[in-house]
Curated annotation (Swiss-Prot):
Transmembrane helix listed as a keyword: yes
Keywords: Antiport, Cell inner membrane, Cell membrane, Ion transport, Membrane, Sodium, Sodium transport, Transmembrane, Transmembrane helix, Transport
Pfam families assigned to the protein according to its UniProt record, in alphabetical order: Na_H_antiport_1 (PF06965)
Entry's family note: Belongs to the NhaA Na(+)/H(+) (TC 2.A.33) antiporter family.
Name of the featured protein: Na(+)/H(+) antiporter NhaA 1
Keyword DNA-binding: no
Amino acid sequence: MAQTPPTSEARPRPPVPTLFRVALAPIQAFFRLEAASGILLALCAVAAMVWANSPWAATYSAVFDARMTVGLAGVHAGFTIREFINDGLMTLFFFVVGMEIKRELSSGELRTFSRAVLPLIAAMGGMIVPAALYAAFNQGTPAQAGWAIPMATDIAFSIGCLTLVKTRVSHGLVVFLTALAIFDDIGGILVIALFYGSGLHVSWLVGALGVLAVLACLNHFQVRNGVAYALAGAALWYTMHHGGIHATLSGVVLGLFMPARPLRPGRHVLEELRLYVDRALQTAMDEATRGAQILYLEERLEELEPPLNRFVHLWHVPVAYGIVPLFALANSGISLEGMGWADLLRPLPLGIIAGLFVGKQVGIFLFTWGSLKLGVADRPGGATLPQLHGVAVVAGIGFTVALFVAGLAFPTQPELLTEAKLGILVGSLLSAVVGYALLRFVAKPAVPA
């Protein structure tokens, strides 16, 4: 039943100074851009490269390799700032990925097989061919452990690239690339879980299963308290870390367990609120009480929003504009001292460049074209073949997850890790520039539906 709203006098909000609003306007306009997160990510990557090759290069390593120690109940753990970002904060990135995957599968573009089949097939091509190309260059060498690096598509960069040519691509193509990147994320998560662990420890994994049971109960009973999920997520991170599975994947699991249904059926809530509003309009009240009633209605309307959507909205901005750019800043700084163009022709960077720039576009385009020819699916948004080819090239921008996998593949081999980062940066840059050029100058403008 509806509760009586508070009748305390509402406090007026202090006016915002005009000068302050004017100063904030460009910042607010930037963050409203669809490509804003991709632009910020690129700026951080460039800043890291400039920093690592400047007279202050030593401070780059000093900052991100600085050690810190935390303790709780007599238990202490030490790690570097970079490890804290990569293994700690990036858990929140994977948490958002997990929630977005669940949202798309439950109520989004991937909720039916007919909608999901084409991006799924395209993603398979975009993972198989790049991995095979990399393996062809590095089979039998110490670098073969990095075979999964060119499998990833960076959704922020790739969608940001499409927004720069939005008059040339239909909304259906943007949805297609987004769904493809989501399946790429799923594939990358499975690869990390299966191939980049550190040796399984059954006792800790049993503990992780216990935490999963708790999460299942929280989901079943539609618990909306964020603290409960945070505590369960922390316990899952700890048990997976000691169990030999990369701990950041706990974020994906936690995201998949977030309730995707509203607490109560929407019709019931709206009926109650309609009756409440009718009674309120028939009663004379002052403006302060009216304001309190409106706040009460807002609180009741929150019951219509599933916890999954609420947490996606809560964490999207800090992850997209804080954690991921910080990850790029901490992991993109490559010293080019003593390097030449010949270094790009080494098997490791060449394998990554070939995988991202050649393997991605060949795999995605051929698998997509084959599916269309066989009648398995329809063209997304009535796209032309040149448009599909351009999107396939853009999907070769494999930045965030590719850097993450590189760190897992070469944790104790800094020279190989540097070569991998160089290959990722060059391959992603080639894919972005060529993909943009194809969509801007070759593909015909999108035809409005």
